């Protein structure tokens, strides 16, 4: 099919190459043979009068011209998919939709497991692909490669989003850690060894670390882990402490001997929100899933302040 001299099928080829950066993988993703894919690349280069891709080993490296074309091509294909190809009434009871959702281990344990349980009742054919927090979430949203992103609202981009729930940060340590006795001061917090969380390949710090860095302060980090759920096991039998959301600390305190105390830092509450690609704003399946997320979030009880909290039996 041609539109003003351009074979529109070539746009699908260009999008696949931008995604896969490999000729064989791109051909497989759109069900073309490798010779047909090579011929399509040649036609793309002729049409746009640019090489579009340079070879580096087996990887296709896009030229500036290809980089400039890619966002418009992806947006056009998504609009066609959502507005024409996929547009139909959404029946959750009969749907086999698979949602791709980026979220943290914390959100999974304190919130999303309830969402999955409810979805199993209302939409048994629906499935979920839960992905770890990524450094390129803005690109994933722009390209429509994910359906939802759940993370602190503070870090969200300009795509549409909605607030889910709030939590507060607390300090945790082993039940036998006497340094967590009251009053637990800021000076003591800074003097102790910490188990800290850093996310993604770029090792992005958490909110409390941002607060300390902005005030020119540096704590003694002795262990770095990839998620909040890894903090409690690293504290057992040590004098180290960790900073994590209260809901998750209470979750682990049921099975791990933890002591939970107020965090001596004036940091704001942790406000979790859900974000989705702007192009999915009117997608019936996305609308249904958003409503389910918001309903489950509204059922969450606000966490109580840990005046002197610990595991049972302390």
Swiss-Prot record:
Q: Which residues form a coiled coil?
A: none
The record, for CDD domains, names: PBP2_NodD
What SUPFAM superfamilies does this protein's entry cite?
Answer: Periplasmic binding protein-like II (SSF53850), Winged helix' DNA-binding domain (SSF46785)
Q: Which UniProt keywords apply?
A: Activator, DNA-binding, Nodulation, Repressor, Transcription, Transcription regulation
PROSITE patterns linked to this entry: HTH_LYSR (PS50931)
Give the molecular function GO annotations: DNA binding; DNA-binding transcription factor activity
Q: Does the keyword Repressor apply?
A: yes
DNA binding happens at which residues? 23-42
Q: Which family does it belong to?
A: Belongs to the LysR transcriptional regulatory family.
- Give a short account of what the protein does: NodD regulates the expression of the nodABCFE genes which encode other nodulation proteins. NodD is also a negative regulator of its own expression. Binds flavonoids as inducers.
Name under which the protein is recorded: Nodulation protein D 2
Designated gene of the protein? nodD2
């Amino acid at each position: 099919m041609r539109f003003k001299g351009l074979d529109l099928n070539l746009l699908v080829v260009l999008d696949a190459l931008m995604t896969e950066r490999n000729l064989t993988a791109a051909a497989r993703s759109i069900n073309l043979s490798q010779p047909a894919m090579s011929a399509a690349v040649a036609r793309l280069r002729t049409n746009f009068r640019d090489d579009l891709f340079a070879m580096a080993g087996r990887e296709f490296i896009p030229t500036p011209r290809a980089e400039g074309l890619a966002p418009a091509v992806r947006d056009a294909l998504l609009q066609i998919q959502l507005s024409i190809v996929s547009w139909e009434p959404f029946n959750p009871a009969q749907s086999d939709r698979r949602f791709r959702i980026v979220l943290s281990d914390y959100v999974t344990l304190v919130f999303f497991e309830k969402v999955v349980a409810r979805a199993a009742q209302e939409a048994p054919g629906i499935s979920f692909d839960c992905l770890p927090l990524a450094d390129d979430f803005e690109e994933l949203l722009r390209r429509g490669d994910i359906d939802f992103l759940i993370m602190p609202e503070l870090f969200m981009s300009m795509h549409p989003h909605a607030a889910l729930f709030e939590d507060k940060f607390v300090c945790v340590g082993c039940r036998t850690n006497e340094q967590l006795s009251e009053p637990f001061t800021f000076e003591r917090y800074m003097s102790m060894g910490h188990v800290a969380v850093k996310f993604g390949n770029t090792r992005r710090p958490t909110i409390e670390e941002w607060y300390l860095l902005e005030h020119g302060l540096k704590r003694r980090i002795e262990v770095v882990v990839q998620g909040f759920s890894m903090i409690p096991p690293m504290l057992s039998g040590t004098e180290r402490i960790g900073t994590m959301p209260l809901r998750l600390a209470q979750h682990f305190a049921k099975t791990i001997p933890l002591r939970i105390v107020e965090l001596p830092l004036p940091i704001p509450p942790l406000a979790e929100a859900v974000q989705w690609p702007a192009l999915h704003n009117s997608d019936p399946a996305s609308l249904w899933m958003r409503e389910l997320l918001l309903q489950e979030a509204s059922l969450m009880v606000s966490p109580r302040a840990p005046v002197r909290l610990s595991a049972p039996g302390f």
